[in-house]
UniProtKB/Swiss-Prot annotation:
Species annotation: Prochlorococcus marinus (strain NATL1A)
EC number: 3.6.1.9
Main localization (coarse): cytoplasm
Protein name (Swiss-Prot/TrEMBL): Nucleoside triphosphate pyrophosphatase
A cellular-component GO term for this protein: cytoplasm
HAMAP family: Maf (MF_00528)
Length: 211
């Protein structure tokens, strides 16, 4: 079985979509402690932090070595003109950002940290360092020109406040996206092509389409 180190419902739905049976373990990693201005490095470190936190929980519960085959930590952020847009903290910030994003483009970066749970190793450091791979997948997103009415109406819904950049491409936010250049599932929360390629790397493609 597969472990997803994320509470994101969108990521869970992506795994359900490809019939990847999984257990969710929400990490205790404190994202606020990471003050990194570079978006690519930051999202990579966040993904690793989440994965390592979930791995620690598994080891403490004595499950990692006999129950699960792989663990994935993910995190996403939106980069707009060199500035990092994470989840909006309030309606005012969301509206302000959308007024800037309207008719413009930016990049959705998702960091991935995949750990193959090797039964021959018993400590966290050995497992995480010697049986892991990481990567950042970036998708360019171009937004439509939006009216103040549209922005305010979207900001009045609950959807954008749990999303990096303040939009959900798979939800109502998809109405405002003109086009993307890159991986679609990456914008939702994780790159399925990246996951498939790296599960194959560890001989774990059998976990996919396990209906």
């Amino acid at each position: 079985m597969f472990v997803l180190a994320s509470a994101s419902k969108a990521r869970q739905k992506l795994l359900d979509q490809i019939a990847l049976r999984h257990k969710v373990i929400v990490s205790d990693f404190d994202e606020t402690q990471l003050q990194e201005p570079d978006p690519i490095l930051k999202v990579k470190l966040l993904a690793k932090g989440k994965a390592d936190s979930a791995l620690k929980k598994l080891i403490e519960e004595n499950h990692a070595l006999n129950t699960y085959q792989a663990l994935l930590g993910c995190d996403s952020l939106f980069e707009f003109k060199g500035e990092i847009f994470e989840k909006p903290i309030n309606k005012e910030q969301l509206i302000s950002r959308w007024k800037r994003m309207s008719g413009q483009s930016g990049f959705l970066h998702t960091g991935h940290y995949l750990i193959s749970l090797d039964n021959s190793k018993s400590d966290m450091e050995s497992i995480s360092q010697n049986n892991s791979c990481e990567g950042v997948v970036s998708t360019k997103i171009e937004f439509m020109n939006l009216s103040n009415f549209e922005i305010n109406k979207y900001a009045s819904t609950s959807e954008p406040y749990n999303c990096a950049g303040g939009f959900a491409i798979e939800g109502n936010g998809g109405l405002f996206i003109k086009k993307i250049d890159g991986c679609f599932s990456n914008v939702i929360g994780l790159s399925l092509p990246w996951l498939k390629n790296n599960l194959e790397k560890y001989g774990l493609s059998r976990l996919l389409l396990d209906r």
